[in-house]
Amino acid sequence: MSEAAETLDGWYSLHLFYAVDWATFRLVPEDEREAMINEFKTFINDKASAREQQAGDYALYNITGQKADILLWYLRPEMKELNEIENELNKLRIADFFIQTYSYVSVIELGNYLAGKSDEDPYQNPHVRARLYPELPRTEYICFYPMDKRRNETYNWYMLPMEERKKLMYNHGMIGRQYAGKIKQFITGSVGFDDFEWGVTLFSDDVLQFKKIVYEMRFDETTARYGEFGGFYIGHILKTDDFEHFFAI
């Protein structure tokens, strides 16, 4: 049997994608719409306090295209806290006009393929902790996609020897390093949590960088032979100060 790679796990993660039922929302009297928007804004701002307390974070983006209108991404120390956030959100009046189009449940993950042997507790390493319990960027653009490692009769990632997987992941990682300073990447593990094995969330102020890195990765053996992908979601940052404009109808 092949050796399983160890992982380091951080905050639990929930990506929520919603379409807005604009046709029905338009029928709501203006004063009621305004009250709903303010209630939603209060909800977002209340949950944002976790960032200052270093007990989680969030991202809010307006998704481009017909897959969704809004992405809310929450990170929390406990999975049950994500349930509480989602339940509270669903009970807001404005949620009656939100149609959930997709969601993704996972946990911030660092692969341990390239880690050397050490007696150090990695969870006490400041660099590691900053990646497991991150403060999310507030860049102009976001990209999210789920992915699997292929396992079929011809190419099965999980049957490769550990040393070969280490080599492939090293080469894969070297491509990503070329985008340091241009893209901030977060990998979340979802084996046993959702329909894919990982979620990939990218942040950048230049949306074209998403296309460049994904295209370049296509020529990497790890991706070309063993990568399988779900849908891609691209969005522009949505600030609570812009809610009035966003929800104006």
Swiss-Prot record:
GO terms for biological process: heme B biosynthetic process. Its cofactor is Fe-coproporphyrin III. InterPro entries: CHDC, ChdC/CLD, Dimeric_a/b-barrel. Fe-coproporphyrin III binds at R131, Y145, P146, M147, D148, K149, H172, Q185. GO terms for molecular function: heme binding; metal ion binding; oxidoreductase activity, acting on the CH-CH group of donors, oxygen as acceptor; peroxidase activity. Fe-coproporphyrin III acts both as a substrate and a redox cofactor. Keywords: Heme, Heme biosynthesis, Iron, Metal-binding, Oxidoreductase. Involved in coproporphyrin-dependent heme b biosynthesis. Catalyzes the decarboxylation of Fe-coproporphyrin III (coproheme) to heme b (protoheme IX), the last step of the pathway. The reaction occurs in a stepwise manner with a three-propionate intermediate. Belongs to the ChdC family. Type 1 subfamily. This is Coproheme decarboxylase. The gene is chdC.
